[in-house]
């Protein structure tokens, strides 16, 4: 069953890519999606040093990345490794000049077998972290093949999530492969345990760590301070 599901997923991904490439001729947004990933492996190989050790962090968009900032800062303190950040959406990547906590920022190549193999071979991550709901089956398979540990943080699961519907057995199998899944609450833990997924720990939400970290920074905005001039504001 799992072999068939893996085959079916790989087939569907390739069909979806082909279909979207056709649609991209008429849709500017989808066209931009593919343009952003054009020559992605050349861009990566030109920027990174293969001799360095890497930690790979993947976030769907800027919001997910913002949650992970305190975690990334702690990783930088603990490991003398280069941190590679990937985004799925354009919202995060467009603001990469503001992102100082990581060493490299790239778009995530589409989750096809060939893309995953090329990407993991290039960056050879010491370990990888996926933020929130970023579960990409072919990347998981390739990380296992590479012998690299990988984790899901800020996980949130409900009993009626799509993970546990049509692709139930397939997705559950992939979730079991994570070295550890850190979830926001006990409800998520219960949902996963009922699906016989045991590699889970309740860690709370990264949002609170993000707020604590933000409070340590200089949050003054000079223009606003000048405008208010210590007046009371409602």
Q: Locations of the language-model features?
A:
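Short, Lys/Arg-enriched N-terminal segments with co-localized hydrophobic residues
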Residues: 1-4
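Low-complexity, intrinsically disordered, cysteine-poor segments enriched in small/polar
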Residues: 7-14, 18-21, 25
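Active-site and donor-binding regions of nucleotide-sugar-utilizing enzymes
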Residues: 21, 25-44, 48-217
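Charged active-site motifs of nucleotide-sugar-dependent glycosyltransferases
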Residues: 51-56, 225-234
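ALDH superfamily catalytic-core signature
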Residues: 212-230
């Amino acid at each position: 069953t799992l072999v068939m599901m893996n085959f079916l997923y790989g087939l569907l991904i390739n069909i979806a890519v082909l279909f979207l490439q056709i649609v991209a001729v008429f849709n500017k947004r989808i066209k931009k999606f593919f343009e952003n990933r054009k020559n992605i492996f050349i861009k990566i190989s030109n920027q990174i040093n293969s001799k360095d050790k890497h930690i790979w962090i993947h976030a769907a968009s800027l919001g997910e990345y913002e949650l992970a900032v305190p975690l990334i800062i702690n990783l930088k303190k603990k490991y003398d490794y280069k941190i590679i950040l990937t985004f799925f959406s354009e919202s995060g990547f467009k603001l990469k000049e503001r992102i100082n906590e990581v060493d490299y920022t790239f778009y995530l190549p589409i989750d096809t077998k060939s893309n995953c193999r090329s990407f993991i071979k290039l960056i050879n991550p010491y370990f990888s972290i996926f933020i929130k709901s970023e579960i990409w089956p072919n990347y998981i398979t390739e990380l296992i093949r590479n012998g690299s540990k990988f984790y899901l943080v800020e996980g949130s699961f409900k009993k009626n999530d799509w993970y546990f519907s049509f692709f139930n057995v397939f997705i559950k199998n992939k979730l079991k492969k994570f070295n550890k899944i850190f979830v926001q609450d006990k409800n998520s833990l219960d949902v996963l345990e009922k699906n016989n997924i045991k590699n889970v720990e309740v860690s709370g939400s990264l949002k609170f760590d993000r707020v604590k970290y933000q409070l340590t920074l200089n949050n003054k905005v000079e223009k606003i301070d000048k405008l208010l001039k210590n007046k009371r504001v409602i």
